[in-house]
Amino acid sequence: MTTLALNLAQYNDPITKGIIAQESLRRVRPDLKAVVNVNPYAIPTSAALVLEKLGIGTHPMSLAVHPHAPCKAIENQILNTVGHLLPKEQPVTFMAMKKSKLNMLRRHPSRADTFINPIYHPRDNVRYGLDPDPDQDASITASFLEVKTSTAFMQDTLHYLTPEDLLDIFETSPKLENLIASFVLPVEATRNMKSLYPDLYSIHYTHGGFQWAPSGHLGDAYFHEPWQLYWLRCGSLTRLIEEETTTTVQPPPGFEGEAYTRVRKEVRELKIYAERVTSIGAHHLFIFSRNAKATPRVRSYSQNGKWVTLPRIFRPVSHNVQTPLKQEVANSLMLYTYAVRPSLKDVAAKVRQKFDEKDLAEHSPLEITHLINYIYYIDQRAYLTNDDDILSDNLLKRWIFTPIQAAYKKAKGFLLGPDDFQKLLKALEWQPVTFDYAVDHYKSNPWRIHASRTGAKMRQLKNFLSRTTGLCEAVEDDALEGSELLKELEGNMWFRNPSEVEKEVFDAIVADLPPDSQRSELILEDPNSNARDYLPIQQDQPSVTQGPDEAAQTQTPTATSMVTNSVAARMPPPVPRTLREHHEQFPTTVRASFEQPSSTRAPETSENNTPAESVTPSPRAIYVGDFAIMDANASTSRASSPSPRRTVVSPRQPEAQNETLGRQIVSRVSPAHGCQMSPYAAQLAHQLSEQTAYTDVIGQRMVAFYSQHSRSYKYGRHEHRSQSWLPVIDSLQVALGLDESYDHCLIQRYRKHARVGLHADDEECYEPDSTIVTLNLYGNADFLIERNTDKASETITLQHNDMLFMPSGMQVTHRHAVCSLYEGRVSITFRNKTKDYLRKSAPDMNPVEQPGASAGQLTGPLDHRPEELPWEHWIPRLNRLGFTGLQKQTDPEGKLIYPITEIRQDMVYVPFPNCCPGPLRKDLEAMGRRPVRYTVDTGRALTLASDIKNNRVGALLQNADLTWKTLLVEYCRMEPTSVPMTVIHGAGGSGKSKLLQDHLNRAELNVVIIVPTRVLQQDWRNKMTEFPSFLVQTYEAAMMESAPQMVVFDDYGKLPHGYIDLFCQFHPSVEYVILTGDARQSTYYEYNSDAGIRNLPTNIEVFKQYCGYYINCTHRNKQDLANMLGVYSEKMGSTHFTFGNTCETGSLLLVPSGTQKTVMGEAGHKTETYAGCQGITADKVQIMIDHDTHKSADSHMYTALSRATEHIHFYNSIAGLNTARFHAKLNLTPYLKTFIQVITERAAAETEPAEYTVQAPTARTHIPVENCSTFLEKDLEEQRAKEDREVYTQAGATNVFQTNSPIVQCFQHQQPKDGALSIITHAKRLQYASAEANQAEYRAKLQIGAALWENFKTAMEIPDEPVPFIRDLWEQSEAEVLSTYLSKSEMAIKNGKNRQDPDWQDERMFVYLKAQWVTKASKFNLPTAKAGQTISAFKQAVVMKFGAMARYLRRITPKPDNIRINCEMQPQDISKWALGLDSHNRPTKQKWNFERPAFASDFEAFDQSQDGAMLHFEALWARHFNVPSSLIEEYLFLKMHAQAPKGYLTIMRLTGEGPTFDANTACSIAYNHTRYEIPKSCMQLYAGDDMLLDQVPVEKTGFKNIAAGLKLTAKTEIFEQKRGKWGEFCSWWMTPYGLVKDPITLYHRILLASEIGDLSKKIDAYAIEAEPAYALQGRLFDCFNEEQMTAHYGTIRRLIIEGKTNFSLDDQAPRHQDLQGILNCMDAKFMYH
C-alpha cells in the first residue's frame, strides 16, 4: 500500500469516507465513461483479465451481452484508435464499414464522408442494408476504385484482398495518400498453433485453411486461407506503370511545315509502404501510404507468454512433439524428472496435472503420447555432467592432459556416439518460438489489369450514354457477360496498358451507336471522374453572329450551358422569403413564361446577341408553368429558361413543336434571383425526414402520410392512414411560405430505380385547382411531365434540395411520373385545398386570395404580414414554436401584447457540453437557448441542506438516513461547482417543454427529468410514452438517487428555494442543466416558519437573469382568454365561461387554500389549489370563489386562470355574491374581476322528487321458556343510595331517582318542575353569545360548511345542477305540517296560545325541561344524575314555516339505494331493504354485509355542536334546491339571533325549531362522509344523530385539517356482527334475519312500566317491538346470547301475563322455516297494531 493510500485509509469517519468516495467517483467517472464507450458488454472474468492486459477495461456493472463480447470490445478499441488517426476537418472514404460505427470514430454523420460498401459475401446485404449496385463488378476491388479523398479507412476487409488489389486501388485513386486498414488474422496460425488467447477466440484448422472463432462460437467464425497471412509481414507494394503523353509540336517561326503529334511513353513507380499501427489479439491495424520513404525492417507480434518447440530426437520425425509448448510447462516437467525418478505412469500423471481440463481438448492423443515419451526419455539420461571442472586445473592438466582428453572424447563420441549427459543436453536444446518477421517487399506485374474492371467500365459507359443521350440502351448487370465484344477486348489484356484497354472499350461502344446519332467527339470534363461525367458536345455550335431568332432555333444545348458554373455554385444562399416574393423577383422574361401566353413573350439575349447562359443552382427551385394557356406551336427565345438535359420526341408531334417543349414546361432560376429553398427550410426538411415513421411499403418505396383534417389518403388500390401532425411540419410550412391549407404532407423514401407511373394527382379528395409543392430532399430523380393533348413530354432531373411547384390546373392538363436515381431518395410533397380541410377548417384559416395573383401562385398568412411589427426579427423563432407572430393583439386595457418579452442582451454564452445530443443542441441553438455558465451558490444550497437535515422541509427526505443528511451538509461546504445551464421561460402552453419532450421521447439519452409534483410527473409520463417512466422523478426522490450527466428541471419555480444549487453541488456528475419555468406563475412556498429557506429569494428571482427572453405566447388558451391575461395566442374561438353556486363533478376544481383542496378532494373532486395547478392542462376547469380568493396573489390567479383550454366554470361558495362587500373584495383580485364581468348565471335542470310507498307492519310472537328472576340482581347490588346519586345545586338537590323501588331508581325521571335539574340542564345544553359573534363564526366556517355540503351532495347523489323549485310539493309540505298541528288535542292547542301571538317576535323562544323517563341502555342505573334535554318553544308560525321547509327538502332530496333514513318507515321496511326483499317479500340480493364488522357513531351534545359550519351547510342545501332566498335568509337570521330569556344563544340545534330531525340527519350524513371514506358498496342507516354502517370506514387523511373547526365530538362503536354482538341502530339490532329490538332495553322498559303501573297503557307498543324477535323462533338462538335470551323470555312472559294471549305457544301458531315465511308473517294483520 502506498503512503497516500495508507493515509487515506486512516479516515474511519463515515462522512469523511463518503466525501472521499464521492471525490474518487468524480475523478474516475470520465474513465468509466471511456471504458463503456469501448466495452459496454458483460465480459467473463477470465476474458476481462486478458482484455485488461491488452489495454481494454471492463465496466463492472455492465449488463449488455454479446455472442463474442471480448472480440467486439477489441474491434471497438481499434475503431477508437482509428478515430484519432483520421483527419478531423477533411472528408474520409470509408470502405466496408457500416455508417452506425461512425460514433466509435467520433465523427458526425453530417460530414461529407463517403461510404463504399461492396457486396462480396451474401451477408453483406444485411450488414450494409443496401442492394448490390447494378454498376458494381463482381470483383470486390471494383467497388473500391476511384477513392476521391486523401485518406480512406477499410474495416476488417483487407485480408480478402491480394496485394494486386491494393495496388489497383492506389493506382486508380491518385488523390488517395493514406489507407488505414484493419483486419483479423491470428499470428499463431503461421505456426499452426492453438489460440494464444483462448478466452478471446479459438482457431480450428480444417480443409487446408483455418476458422477464426471469436469466443469459440463457430456460428460467428471466419474462414481464412493460408495466403492471407501474408499481410502480417507486408512491408511495401511496388508496381511499374506505363504512361503515355501526347504533345503537339509546331514548326519554328519562319519555317514552313505542318504540326505533328509526338507520343512519349514513360514508366513511373507506384510504391506503397505498409506499417503496423497496433495489434490487439488477432486484430491488427495497418496504414498504407504512398508518400512514405521506409518501413521498419522487422515486425514483431505478441506471443502471450514464452513458447518453445521441443527438439526432434526420435525417428521418424512424425513421432516427435510437433506443436509449441509453454516454456513454464516444459521447465516444470523437466524439474519434476530431476527431483524424482518417476516411472512412465508417473510422468503421464504429471502431464495430466499440468494441463487444465479445457487445455486437454486442444491436444491430440498422439501429441500427449509423444510428450510423455520425451519427458521420460530425458528422465532416463544422466543428470550429472562428466566434464572436467576448471577449479581442479593445474599447469600440466591445462596444457597436456585436458587437450588429450578432449580429443579423445570427441573421437569416441564420433565413433560410438555421445554419452547420456551429452544426449540430455541435445534433448534440452529447446527452440524459443517468436513471432518476429522480416517484412516482405512485394513487386507487381507492371502491365496487369483485371478483366472485371473492363466489364464494369463498359457497363458504366453504356448506362451513361443511355441517360444522357438516349442513343443506346441501358445495360443490365450481367448483360455483357460472355459477349463477343468483351471477349475480343479481353484478348491479351494482361500485357497491355490499362488506359489503352479502356479507350478501346469506349471506342467500341461509340461504334455500336446508330450512325445518325454518333458524335464526332466525346470529352471527359474531369480526368479523375467516372463514366457518368462524360458529356456529349454538339459539333455544330451556334455562331456568335447569329441573331436571336437563329439562336432560338438551336435544338441542342451547348456543353457550356450544361456544366455547373463553379463560381455561382459557391455563392452564399440568399435570405429565405415567401414563394410569392420569389415569384415577384423573377426576371421579367422568366415570369413571362408563367404569366403570359407564349405568343406574347419576348426573347432575351445577352449583350453579344448570344443566348444567355443559365446556371443550375444547388439547391434550386423549379416552377412548372401554367400549361393551360400554353401555345405548343409558338416559337420563343430559349433564353427564358435553360434547356433540359434531354427531350423525348413524341412520334406524333412535329419537330418544331418539340423544340420548345422543354422551355414551355420548366423554368429554372439561378440563385442570384433568390428562388432557392432556404438553409433553414432545408434543415427543417431534414429534421422532418429524421422524425418520419414510415407506415406503408408500396413496391420499392416507403410512405408516410400526415394530415390534420383527413383520416387517410387513398389513390388507386392504395390507402395511407394519417399519422399525428408533427410540429416540425408546421415550422417547415412557415419557412416555405405555405399557409395552413396545405394540409396533406406525403413523405416517400425510394429505392434505386423505383418508379411511379404517369398519374395526374386528381384524386377525389382534392379540389381541381389545388397546388402541389414537392421537396426533393435526398438524391436525384427523373421527373417526367406529359401533356394530355398531344402526349408531348419533358424530363426534369431533380437534384438534392430541389423544390418543384406544380400550379393549379395541372391535374387537368398534364400527367407526371418519377424515377429515383438514388438509393434512399426522399421526397416531401405538400398539397392544398383538400376537401376535408375546406369542410372542417375555420373560414379564417383558408388561403387568402390576393389581388392580381395568378392561378399558380401560392398565397397564405405570410402574404399578409402586418407592417412595422416590433418583433419582426423574432418571427423565425416564433415560427419554430408554432406561431406565425403576424397578429397585433391587445390586452383588456388596449395595450399591445408582445409575443417575446424580457429580452436580455448581456448574456455570456458557453459551448454546449458533450452530453447534450446533437439534434437537441441544434434546436436549442436555433431558438437562442444556448447555455451559460452558472456557479452554484453554496449558501443557498447549505440553507436547504440544513433544513433537510433538521427535518424542517420535505416529506420523503425526513425519512432519510442521518448520515446521508450530514453528508449533504458537508458537500455544501466544499468548493462550489459550476455547470452549463439553459434557462427557458415562457407562458403556460408556449411549448417550452415540447421541444425537450420531442427529443427525449425518440432518443435514448442519459437524462433525468425532475418535477415538483406528482401531477406534473404523470403529465410528463403520459406525453412521453417511449421515455422510461422511472427517469421522470419528483424532486425529493431525485435528490436521494444518483444523477446522470444531463438534468431537466421542469417548472423549477415550484421547487424549494436552493434546491437546484444543492442538487448540482451534491451530484458532481451533472454536466448540463436545463430549467423550464414561468416567471409570471406561482412559486414554491414553505409553510414551516422555522425553515431557513423561507428567507431565501425564489428560484425564479435567482435564475431569470440567465434567461435570454420570455415566450409570452400560448397554444393552450384561446385568444380571448389569453388576451385577458396579457398573453399572445393564435388559437381562435371563444372560451366558454359559466357561473353557479354548485360544484360540478368530473372536471378539475381549483380552490384557493390547501384546506379546501383536502376537503373537496375527499368529497370526490379532482382538486388542486390555485398555485398548485401549475403544469396542468385541462379542457374544463372549475374555480372556487370564497372568502380566501381575494387573498390570493396575482401569480396564483394567473396560474389558475390559464389552465383551461375550452371552458371555465366559476363556483361560488359564498352567500351574497352580489353584495357591495363582495365586489369590493373582487377589486383586490384584478384577474378575477375581469372574468366575473363576462359571466352569466346558468339555469338548473328540473328534477322530480321520488315518492315512497309506506306499508303498515304486523307481527306474531313465539318464545321458549327461560328463567329471568335474577336478571337485575347484579345491577341492584351495585346501586348506590339515592342521596349519593342526586346532584346538589343552589336550588337544592335534583329529584331524578324516585320512589323506593330499586328497579325504578335504575331509571332517571326528568321533570320540568325539577328546578335543580333545570339549572344543570340549562348550563350544559345552552350556550350564549352575541349576534355579532354568531355572524363572525358563520363567516369563519364557510369553507367547512362548503366541504360538508360537497360530501353530502356526493353521498346522496344530488345532481350538480341546481334543482328547480316545485311549488306543488311545497304546498303539500305546508299542508302536511298544518294537518299534523291540527291533529293535536284541543287542550294542547289551547295551551300553546301564547306561541300563536302575532306580536311575539320570531327569534324569541321559551326554553324548558323535557319530561321523560330515561330508558336508554347506556344511561341505565347511572351512579349520578345527568342533565336532561331542553325544549325550545318558538313561535308556532315559525315552527310550521321551517317545518314545511324541512319536509320539502326531505322529500325532494334523492336517496341512494345504499342509504336509508329511519323516517316515515317501519322496521319491516328497513329489514326488507337490508335483506334484499322486494315488495312481495321475495329475496333478490342481500345488501347488508354480515361478513365484516359493523360501525356505529353517536355524538356528544349533538344539538349544541351544530355551529356555523352546519348552518352554512343547511343554507347551501336549501339554496341548491332553490328554496326561496327570502326564506333562507330568514332562517339564517333566526339561527344567528335566537334569543332565550337570558340572551342570544350561539348557533346550535334547538329541539322544537321545526327542521330538527331532518337537519340532524343531514348533518350526520354530511359529517360522517366528510370524516370517513365511505364507499358506495357500504350500506348506511341514519336517524337524527344515530348511524349504522355495515363496514368500518377509514378516516380521511385531510379531516384533521378541519376537525379543529368543528364542535362535533363523535362516539364510535364497532360491532363484530356475531351472536349477541349485532350492530345497534335506535335500540334495534341488525341481524341476518332483519331488525330485532334490543331485548335487554325492551325488558328494562317493561319492568319500569310494570313498577310504575303504566304497563297496561304501553303493552301494545311493547308487543309490536317484540314481534320481529318472537317470529324468528329457533333462529333466535343465532341472534341472542344467554343474557339476551333471558331478557327476551322475560319480555314475552310479562306480555302473556298481562293478557296478550296471542303470544301463547299453541300448535296452531305458524312455524316459519325460512326468511320469506318470517316476513310474510310479520306483514300479516296484527291485532295489537
UniProtKB/Swiss-Prot annotation:
UniProt xrefs under CDD domains: Alphaflexiviridae_RdRp
Catalytically driven reaction(s): RNA(n) + a ribonucleoside 5'-triphosphate = RNA(n+1) + diphosphate; ATP + H2O = ADP + phosphate + H(+)
Cofactor binding annotation: Binds 1 Fe(2+) ion per subunit.
Binding residue positions for 2-oxoglutarate: R825
Keyword list, A-Z: ATP-binding, Dioxygenase, Helicase, Hydrolase, Iron, Metal-binding, Nucleotide-binding, Nucleotidyltransferase, Oxidoreductase, RNA-directed RNA polymerase, Transferase, Viral RNA replication
InterPro entries documented for this protein: (+)RNA_virus_helicase_core_dom, AlkB-like, AlkB-like_sf, Alphavirus-like_MT_dom, DNA/RNA_pol_sf, Oxoglu/Fe-dep_dioxygenase_dom, P-loop_NTPase, RNA-dep_RNA_pol_alsuvir
Residue stretches of biased makeup (Low complexity): 635-652
BP GO annotations: DNA-templated transcription; mRNA modification; RNA processing; viral RNA genome replication
Function: RNA replication. The central part of this protein possibly functions as an ATP-binding helicase.
Family: Belongs to the potexvirus/carlavirus RNA replication protein family.
Protein name: RNA-directed RNA polymerase
Provenance organism: Lolium latent virus (isolate Lolium/USA/US1/-)
